[in-house]
């Protein structure tokens, strides 16, 4: 059936997939992400090199041209992200204008706006080099979108903010107590360094952080005892937040970028009859993907590029009008998306996550190559699909194997 969605909505969703939902899984999304990261690094590198007078004098025009190119690229990205804002799950219920505004005032939207501000300042504002340098360096914050590690770290800081705030309060108390004790012990001996509690706080902060510049040291026995206690306290102060962040960071990384392991693949019923060697081979083909509750895996009418296995969680399949809009719910161990891949047609259903779901993604070309290697998989797919939908794939096993042979030849 022909997709009646307006062309501009299809285009908007396409760009949303490239920049957001499939930025880490689709080939085009990965290319665009790397392209943007390249311009972030280039822009920051130009800012650093421009601070060297000799390089600014010799390559000033080149730096200006490259900076203008970076600004143009960041501006295009920013305007596209404003346009695709209604595609974001939290903004689905909003009008396009409200969704665009919600994105613009979000933390990521503000960072994207800062990235293009040097262009606006250069065109309409004062030529203040210090302001431009600061704004250019703030582009490093864009890495939070393109680096899963930075996103995970920000998530950890957000989730553990109360514990970290408690550590900060304890550190402030320890600093004040240490500074007061050192002021009492050393204030009369070194009045220029410990004459007041605020003066002594510099020493306390440096000592508690275990940096120890050595510019201020105690001269009395009591002062050394206070310093020893402060050093031991500093080790504890550093260990507390480090342990909290490290443990939470490990949990977030495991939850977000889970590893495709042998037991995970072996639990999938479609692969349960295979040998250990075959499962090890399939492990190399599968990619891990985690989606949140309500997130769309793919929509009806989109090109089919991969099939999916549910490692954990649940999804809901909304079939098309030819199936009277019937909905099917699948859980852990099931698979979906194989029909369109094997028939080389567009998606006939829309799939959404019912809960936080971990998926194993198998590329269409790899699926056909796998069928050529293990024909029993094709037979089992036919059986499972027929039991699920009440109809056969209408593809003979020989046809599937033939498609696999063609795919292998194309990739050779």
UniProtKB/Swiss-Prot annotation:
Topology with respect to the bilayer: Multi-pass membrane protein
Residues involved in a nucleoside 3',5'-cyclic phosphate binding: 270-388
Motif window: Selectivity filter: 210-215
PROSITE patterns attached to this UniProt entry: CNMP_BINDING_2 (PS00889), CNMP_BINDING_3 (PS50042)
SUPFAM superfamilies: cAMP-binding domain-like (SSF51206), Voltage-gated potassium channels (SSF81324)
Example GO biological process: action potential
Annotated localization: Cell membrane
Record-annotated membrane-spanning stretches: 35-55, 65-85, 164-184, 202-222, 225-245
SMART domains named in the record: cNMP
GO terms, molecular function: voltage-gated potassium channel activity
CDD domains: CAP_ED
Keywords from the UniProt entry: Cell membrane, Ion channel, Ion transport, Membrane, Potassium, Potassium channel, Potassium transport, Transmembrane, Transmembrane helix, Transport
Protein origin, superkingdom: Bacteria
Signal peptide: none
Listed GO CC annotations: voltage-gated potassium channel complex
Family from the record: Belongs to the potassium channel family.
Name of the protein this chain belongs to: Putative potassium channel protein RPA4233
């Amino acid at each position: 059936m022909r997709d009646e969605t307006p062309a501009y909505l299809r285009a908007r969703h396409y760009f949303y997939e490239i920049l957001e939902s499939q930025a880490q899984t689709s080939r085009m999304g990965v290319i665009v992400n790397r392209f943007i990261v390249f311009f972030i690094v280039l822009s920051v590198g130009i800012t650093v090199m421009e601070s060297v007078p000799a390089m600014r004098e010799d390559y000033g025009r080149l730096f200006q041209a490259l900076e203008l190119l970076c600004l143009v690229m960041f501006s295009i990205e920013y305007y596209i992200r404003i346009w695709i804002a209604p595609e974001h799950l939290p903004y689905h219920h909003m009008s396009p204008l409200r969704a665009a505004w919600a994105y613009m005032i979000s933390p990521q939207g503000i960072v994207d706006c800062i990235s293009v501000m040097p262009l606006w300042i250069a065109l309409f504002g004062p030529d203040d080099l210090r302001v431009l340098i600061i704004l250019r360096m703030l582009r490093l914050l864009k890495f939070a979108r393109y680096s899963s590690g930075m996103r995970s770290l920000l998530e950890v800081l957000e989730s553990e903010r109360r514990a970290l705030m408690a550590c900060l309060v304890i550190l402030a108390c320890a600093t004040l107590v240490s500074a007061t004790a050192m002021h009492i012990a050393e204030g009369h001996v070194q009045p220029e360094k410990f004459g007041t509690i605020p003066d002594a706080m510099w020493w306390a902060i440096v000592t508690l952080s275990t940096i120890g510049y050595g510019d201020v040291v105690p001269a009395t026995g009591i002062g050394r005892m206070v310093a020893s206690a402060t050093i031991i306290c500093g080790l504890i102060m550093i260990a507390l937040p480090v342990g909290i962040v490290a443990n939470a960071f490990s949990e977030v990384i495991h939850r977000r970028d889970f590893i495709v392991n042998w037991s995970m693949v072996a639990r999938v019923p479609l692969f349960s009859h295979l040998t250990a060697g075959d499962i090890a081979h399939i492990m190399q083909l599968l990619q891990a993907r985690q989606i949140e509750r309500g997130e769309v895996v793919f929509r009806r009418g989109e090109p089919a590029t991969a099939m999916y296995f549910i490692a954990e969680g649940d999804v809901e399949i909304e079939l098309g009008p030819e199936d009277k809009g019937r909905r099917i719910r699948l859980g852990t161990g099931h698979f979906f998306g194989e029909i369109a891949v094997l028939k080389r047609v567009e998606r006939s259903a829309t799939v959404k996550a019912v809960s936080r779901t971990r998926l194993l993604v198998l590329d269409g070309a790899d699926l056909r190559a796998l069928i050529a290697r293990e024909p029993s998989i094709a037979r089992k797919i036919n059986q499972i699909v027929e039991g699920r939908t009440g109809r056969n794939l209408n593809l003979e096993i020989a046809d599937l194997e033939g498609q696999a042979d063609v795919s292998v030849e194309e990739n050779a």
